[in-house]
């Protein structure tokens, strides 16, 4: 594969600015920050549900590029309350299983909308499915 492919997915929340959900260049994939907005536009009030929805959105974007969870090499999680990391860690562990990507957690004062509590972005290398 050569060139750059951009993915603007119909089953994802509409971007709030000028970007796409994922970009693939060769075997590298960048997944834009995604939040816990359901396809119907609703937002769960609970951080755990928001993270579950965000992870589902991230996974669908990853799979649209041909990737799988084990291809993810780096994640960044942005939390309004960093103490919520203990609540969302079981979801991460269930998603990644034995695979452990590099990870950064950042506490932030706000996201794009006041009801949002968590956002996740990731990078993947599609031929990196083995540890």
Q: What do the predicted segments below correspond to?
A:
Residues 1-131:
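Short, polar/acidic, helix-capping and beta-turn segments at strand->helix junctions
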């Amino acid at each position: 594969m050569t060139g750059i492919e951009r993915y603007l997915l119909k089953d994802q929340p509409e971007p709030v600015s000028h970007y796409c959900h994922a970009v693939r260049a060769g075997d590298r994939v960048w997944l834009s920050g995604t939040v816990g907005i359901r396809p119907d536009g609703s937002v769960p009030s609970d951080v755990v549900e928001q993270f579950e929805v965000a992870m589902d959105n991230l996974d669908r974007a990853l799979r649209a590029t041909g990737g799988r969870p084990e291809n993810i090499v780096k994640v960044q999680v942005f939390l309004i309350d960093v103490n919520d990391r203990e609540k969302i860690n079981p979801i991460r562990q269930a998603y990644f299983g034995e695979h452990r990507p590099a990870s950064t957690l950042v506490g932030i004062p706000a996201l794009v909308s006041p009801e949002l509590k968590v956002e996740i972005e990731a990078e993947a290398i599609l031929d990196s499915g083995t540890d």
